[in-house]
């Protein structure tokens, strides 16, 4: 039988709820954790440049949870957004998806998106994956991992949409 649990951002806000879920797990179970928001906040202690936690967030509790899950030999899976990241987009505006007026494109959730074809963005994601691997995560599930469709996005004039999509 398969055994596992998904610890969402909402669950991570209540460590009592998380503790109950983890105690019920058999050793070696799969556990997927939300570890970053679309706004660029990290839910664990990250050493990446510009990484910060949400206000009033206990990253040490999440770090301790990861340690406990590793002690139980759990199969750790990280879940995080790939290209929607306000903090990175604002810190590296040239790596965001621009509108024709130069402002950054924002999705319906109020999140700025990064250019999936950008080498800087791809390196950032690789660094994030490497950090999570060092913390014991065996898989990473990216969401918001696509080129957004919007007539308002002004892709570089020297690249067509097809070329941009092929580059990623």
Name each region found by the language model.
Residues 8-17, 38-39, 55-56, 85:
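Acidic-and-aromatic substrate-binding clefts and catalytic sites of carbohydrate-active enzymes
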Residues 18-24, 61-65, 128, 167-168:
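A general structural detector for well-ordered alpha-helical segments in enzyme core domains, enriched
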Residues 39-81, 149-168:
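Aromatic-lined substrate-binding rim segments of carbohydrate-active enzymes
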